[in-house]
Regions:
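Membrane-anchoring hydrophobic helices of lipid-metabolizing enzymes
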Residues: 1-62, 105, 168-170, 195-208
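Generic beta-sheet signal
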Residues: 91, 118, 146-149
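Short, hinge-like loop/turn segments at secondary-structure boundaries
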Residues: 82-85, 107-108, 161-168
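Catalytic-site beta-strand/loop segments enriched in glycine and acidic/polar residues
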Residues: 104-136, 140
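Catalytic core of membrane glycerolipid acyltransferases/transacylases, capturing the structured
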Residues: 42-96, 157
């Protein structure tokens, strides 16, 4: 018998909290982001899907917006993230993606929230930046912040499409932020989007 996702969410939430409490979290180069916040600006943290666990240890409880797959597994993730204070738009590249993007823009604009996006999710290809994060940052005039979650000790789920990384208890997690930048193009045609996705991928790889 399949257990409904909503019944699993509380246990997963408390498991995450207990696991997170064992980690030694270090945020690197957050000062440029703090200066943007001090000036009333918005940011979109852009990370790889396989490093999501480490990345949200630095951002939990910050009332951020994210986009989560419309799949059943996505329902579990959305439930846990919601309990952590995230606002989750449900969608993907193949289902409801445009609607989720519009919802995310509206909530970030109306509520003054920042965003966090797994740029190659929810199904890959691994470490290939998709278009959505570029459109999101451009529509909001928000700063993009390349973000890596680097763990000293981790379990790698080798059979997962993204080789998901789970930091082991007592591991040191370095959440490394690249320099924030804005998308300068006034309009986004496909060549401009392709340039921006390549630019972001290069910045992410350079961080680790």
């Amino acid at each position: 018998m399949r257990i409904p996702p909503e019944r699993l969410v509380p246990a997963l939430y408390w498991t995450f909290r207990a696991w997170e409490a064992t980690l030694r979290i270090e945020e690197v180069n957050l000062d440029p982001v703090r200066r943007i916040w001090d000036q009333g600006g918005r940011v979109v943290f852009a990370c790889w899907h396989n490093e999501l666990f480490a990345c949200i240890t630095g951002r939990a409880d910050k009332k951020m917006v994210t986009i989560v797959s419309a799949s059943g597994d996505g329902a579990l993730l959305a439930g846990v993230l919601s309990r952590l204070g995230f606002w989750c738009a449900r969608g993907s590249s193949s289902r409801f993606g445009v609607r989720a993007l519009v919802q995310a823009v509206k909530v970030m604009r109306d509520q003054g929230r920042d965003g966090v996006v797994t740029v190659d999710g929810p199904r890959g290809p691994r470490h290939q930046v998709k278009d959505g994060v570029v459109y999101l940052a451009h529509r909001l005039g928000a700063y993009l912040v390349p973000t890596r979650g680097l763990s000293s000790r981790k379990h790698v789920f080798a059979r997962a499409w993204d080789r998901f990384e789970l930091p082991l208890p007592l591991a040191r997690c370095r959440v490394v932020y690249g320099e924030p930048y804005r998308i300068e193009a006034e309009t986004l045609d496909q060549p401009a989007v392709d340039r921006e996705t390549a630019r972001l991928a290069e910045k992410l790889h350079a961080l680790g």
